[in-house]
Design a protein with these regions (language model features):
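Alpha-helical subdomain
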Residues: 1-77, 172, 177-343
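Conserved Class I S-adenosyl-L-methionine-dependent methyltransferase catalytic core
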Residues: 2-6, 14-41, 54-55, 61-176
């Protein structure tokens, strides 16, 4: 029998998560203020998202992330569908203000991440994974054994804190079979199967991560509860016969069209009454907070094709795919869980 994975940490690592999740926040301010003079122009002309994109020559996904981050920081406010520069932004981030901090942030504008943000805003193409020089984009790098092993381990370690919190809020009592879609190491499948009587789980991953998952599940003594199948979530139909689908820290890697595709595939594979569980960092209904989630979304925007989604956005996407009985609950370390039933 392996370790009890259902026990949470004895001390609080919340701030440690926030340092890592918000690592790129200052670089996004530097890129906007110095490369685009964003706040000076917005102060003279409030704009909606489409107008921001046209005026600054930027794309909707990164612009949406940027505006949510600025709103959470009290630098923009949304009124009547348009974004306005706040008094704070006017005083400290416009070029003609005597208290302008643009020269202060200009000392950061040559940082690699700040330069990446300028490119990402203009092209909507994520940068390479920041810890690896001369690497392929993240989605391609995950097909290589070395990168996949390191990345999977990085994501796996969070599960010892986030998994028990997910278990408390997921509402899986009485469920029998869970499919952990793009489940990485299988840590969340292991926690949920250990902590839910009668539940068995299957991790769906593409090579080489499927092999990594088998090894890690075996090391945790969970091979009797959790199995692994290989597959591509975008090319292959999802396996049938499960009454729970789990997307844990998956949807934030993808833009809306691919999120729609994944939710539709889930709906196609689930029988009525089955449950979808989306464990992630979610923005609020207005997409102007929580602050730390908007900062994390900036990091995700820079290295993946996705971002953090708002609770309202997820409700609409799930309803469109054929799910109802929407429920939202906070879990741990700025993460949360959304559940919905297949109609």
């Amino acid at each position: 029998m392996g370790p009890d994975l259902t026990r949470g940490p004895e001390t609080d690592p919340h701030q440690l998560y926030r340092y890592r999740d918000g690592l790129y926040a200052a670089d996004l301010i530097a890129a906007a203020a110095c490369e685009f003079d964003f706040f000076t122009r917005l102060a003279s002309e409030p704009m909606d998202l489409g107008e921001v994109c046209r005026s600054f020559g930027v794309h909707a996904r990164p612009a949406d992330v940027m505006l949510s981050f600025f709103a959470a920081n009290g630098l923009v406010r949304k009124d009547g569908g348009r974004f306005h520069a706040t008094a704070t932004a006017r005083e400290h981030l416009t070029k003609d203000s005597p208290r302008s901090l643009i020269p202060y942030y200009a000392s950061l504008k040559e940082r690699p991440v700040a330069k990446d943000f300028a490119v990402i805003l203009r092209t909507d193409r994520p940068a390479n994974w920041g810890s690896y020089k001369d690497e392929k984009p993240w989605t391609e790098a995950m097909l290589t054994e070395e990168f996949a092993t390191g990345f999977t381990a990085a994501m796996d370690c969070r599960g010892f804190t986030l998994g028990p919190a997910l278990l408390r809020e997921a509402g899986l009592a009485g469920r029998r079979s869970l499919l952990d879609i793009a489940g990485g190491s299988g840590i969340y499948a292991c926690v949920l199967a250990q902590g839910t009587p009668g539940l068995r789980a299957t991790v769906l991953e593409r090579p080489p991560v499927d092999g990594i998952a088998r090894t890690m599940i075996r090391k945790r003594g969970c091979e009797g509860l959790v199995t692994v199948v290989a597959g591509d979530i975008f090319r292959d139909p999802l396996p049938q016969g499960h009454d729970v689908h789990l997307f844990s820290n998956v949807l934030h890697d993808w833009d809306v069209p691919k999120v729609r595709q994944l939710l539709r595939a889930s709906a196609d594979a689930l029988a009525p009454g089955s449950l979808i569980v989306i464990h992630d960092a979610h923005l609020n209904e207005a997409k102007d907070g929580p602050l730390q989630v908007t900062a994390y979304s900036a990091l995700l925007m820079s290295v993946t094709e996705g971002r953090c989604y708002g609770v309202g956005e997820m409700r609409e996407l799930l309803a469109e795919a054929g799910f109802g009985s929407f429920r939202f609950a906070e879990t741990a370390c700025d993460r949360s869980v959304i559940t919905a039933a297949r109609l």
